[in-house]
Amino acid sequence: MMVGYAGAQAGFTANLMVAGTDTLLQGLTNDAIKAFMPETTFAVDATCNWFFMIASTFLCSLVIGWCSVHMIEPRLGKYEGSGNAKLDEVTPQQKKGLHAAGITALIYMALIAVLFFMGPLAGENGKFVGSPFLKGLIPILFVLFSICGLSYGYVSGSFKNINDVNKAMAKQMAGMGSYVLFCFFCGQFQGLFNWTKLGTLLAIGGADFLENVGFTGIPLCVAFILLCSFVNIFVSSGSAKWAIFAPIFVPMFMLLGYHPGFTQLCYRIGDSPFNCWTPMSAYIWMILSVAQTKYVPNLKIGTLIANMIPMSIVLQIAWIIFLVIWMLLGIPFGPGVGIYLPAGVM
């Protein structure tokens, strides 16, 4: 269970395919670019970190697996089990609901594929990069999960009418209240930053200082990653942190000649590993509750965190080394995205 949780949290945003997180962070990055250079047409795409994240998926799997075998399992010993575990049986109606949800998903994905290959969702000359499909990935995913959930609910009998749907949505959103409130203040913070031009002033001052002291290149990138890791202990939401960081660090790194997609990538590397043990994450308390209910009733939060910390530190070090090797080899991080800005942007 710990390994699965670490893979989902510490390896967060490392995917084989472009995900909603890519679109979310890319939007915040482009907002920072626009605030810094209002007249520019330059922007990053949702695929700006794609190549690196594909490779990172395998890196995270190997590192977390190695840590589990050599560091975590020897400390915990062999789990014998209570022998009283009971699984809820899936009813025939629930099976019908799952079948309906699966068929709905297939039909919807087929429709999206047709719209892409027929033209409306494709980019210029049929390109995938920069296409309306990628720009609209979040609403596309929202509709997918919404119609699948509705199909399952009505066929399985969980939903009788629209009031049941409203109640289910309200129940799920109840736990998101603190996040929505935090996003509100992040939006106000970002708006004030753009209005006062404080982000631009900090970016210019910071870039001049770093250039004068010669603190650029790999040391700068590693320092930025470690800063993101430290802040992640206190603010676990990746989008909330990037909403605060992007207006400052995207322009600052652009003034030093670095591509915004590369800056975003450094942030993502620092944002992920410590997710698996920070007490500020609601998920660690959820996994503790599940572990106490199903496996180890006397498990404490300290034991869980103590086993997560070594794994996160090893992954953070491995990920930084992997990035440095990638930089030295000069491999693109995504389609058309390298370390430095294209000529003529600044």
Which stretches of residues belong to each language-model region?
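Hydrophobic alpha-helical transmembrane segments of multi-pass integral membrane proteins
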Residues: 1, 180-189, 212-251, 255-256, ...
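Hydrophobic, small-residue-rich membrane helices and short re-entrant helix-turn-helix hairpins
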Residues: 82-99, 124-128, 154-176, 297-306
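Interfacial loop-to-helix junctions that mark the boundaries of transmembrane helices
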Residues: 43-55, 92-98, 125-141, 211-215, ...
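Juxtamembrane interface elements at the cytosolic ends of transmembrane helices
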Residues: 63-86, 114-124, 142-162, 288
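Core transmembrane alpha-helical segments of multi-pass membrane transporters/permeases
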Residues: 130-200
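Helix-loop-helix junctions that connect adjacent transmembrane helices in secondary transporters/permeases
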Residues: 194-219, 226
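Transmembrane alpha-helix interface/packing and boundary motifs in multi-pass membrane proteins
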Residues: 11-15, 190-192, 226-239, 268-276
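Membrane-core helix-loop-helix motifs of multi-pass transport proteins
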Residues: 1-79, 92, 265-268, 284-325, ...
